[in-house]
Amino acid sequence: MARYFRRRKFCRFTAENVVEIDYKDIATLKNYISESGKIVPSRITGTRAKYQRQLARAIKRARYLALLPYTDNHQ
């Protein structure tokens, strides 16, 4: 059996000393949304609880203002 090296998860917002996550920063928010449009959980991204709450709030605000989609593009 081949074992693989699991990369250590870390909070990007803590490393960059981010004070608050902005809902207008669409490029950052898109990294934390799945293909289907759902918010990716912190156990997968490695984001701390404080920033995960801010992230969820920012994504929901961006969705409300139509900056981000609620779901994927149906075809």
Curated annotation (Swiss-Prot):
Supply the alphabetized keyword list.
Acetylation, Ribonucleoprotein, Ribosomal protein, RNA-binding, rRNA-binding
Which InterPro entries does the protein's record reference?
Ribosomal_bS18 (IPR001648), Ribosomal_bS18_CS (IPR018275), Ribosomal_bS18_sf (IPR036870)
Q: SUPFAM superfamilies from the entry?
A: Ribosomal protein S18
Q: Which residues carry this modification: N-acetylalanine?
A: 2
rRNA-binding found in the keyword field: yes
Query: Gene Ontology terms, cellular component aspect?
Result: cytosolic small ribosomal subunit
Q: Which GO terms describe its biological process?
A: translation
MF terms from GO for this chain are:
small ribosomal subunit rRNA binding; structural constituent of ribosome
Disulfide bond in keyword set:
no
Write down the PANTHER family for this protein, in alphabetical order: 30S RIBOSOMAL PROTEIN S18, SMALL RIBOSOMAL SUBUNIT PROTEIN BS18M
Q: State the function annotated in the UniProt record.
A: Binds as a heterodimer with protein bS6 to the central domain of the 16S rRNA, where it helps stabilize the platform of the 30S subunit.
Please describe the quaternary structure of this protein: Part of the 30S ribosomal subunit. Forms a tight heterodimer with protein bS6.
Tell me which family the UniProt entry assigns to this protein.
Belongs to the bacterial ribosomal protein bS18 family.
Name of the featured protein = Small ribosomal subunit protein bS18
Q: Which organism is it from?
A: Haemophilus influenzae (strain ATCC 51907 / DSM 11121 / KW20 / Rd)
What does UniProt list as this organism's lineage?
Bacteria, Pseudomonadati, Pseudomonadota, Gammaproteobacteria, Pasteurellales
